Amino acid sequence: MSKSTNVSYERVELFENPKVPIEVEDEILEKYAESSLDHDMTVNELPRFFKDLQLEPTIWKLVRNEDVIIEGTDVIDFTKLVRCTCQLLILMNNLTVIDDLWSMLIRNCGRDVDFPQVALRDHVLSVKDLQKISNLIGADQSSGTIEMISCATDGKRLFMTYLDFGCVLGKLGYLKM
């Protein structure tokens, strides 16, 4: 794991706006063009797009529409789609790391026992779950539980998904780029 000792703006920016290899961008563009040849690509076409690129379904199904659309529409924004797809590729290349750390969080807050039928990557962590983990490790309650979720979700939700968690790890430098 390539852990950095401090988080720099450059590190966060590298994950938020990854450098896209030309061959990857070409393949994304090709699949996008196939989906939008005679019309604008919409969110309804995302599943097929991601399947055509052979991306991991348990990851891409967590992508939120608002992260890839032109605001106020259901039309896909190509720039956002490229960024999102590249981030998904980074996450897919680091599934073992993300799975191990996510599993540890799920176990330590008790969600694995409370919701045994839920697949690992389908769990969500709430503020309450993170507070349980903070108590378990003896961290001060004011240690930023809400701030952590707010950072992971850009302040949009009070729970964190597997995808959110993977993105936080990427921003912190725990994932191989």
From Swiss-Prot:
Cross-link (Glycyl lysine isopeptide (Lys-Gly) (interchain with G-Cter in ubiquitin)): K19
GO cellular component terms listed in the entry, alphabetical order: nucleus
Tagged with keyword Ribosomal protein: no
Cellular localisation: Nucleus
Gene: RAD33
Signal peptide (UniProt feature, chain positions): none
Keywords, alphabetical: Acetylation, DNA damage, DNA repair, Isopeptide bond, Nucleus, Ubl conjugation
Keyword Glycosyltransferase attached: no
Lineage of source species: Eukaryota, Fungi, Dikarya, Ascomycota, Saccharomycotina
Name the record gives this protein: DNA repair protein RAD33
GO biological process terms held by the UniProt record: nucleotide-excision repair
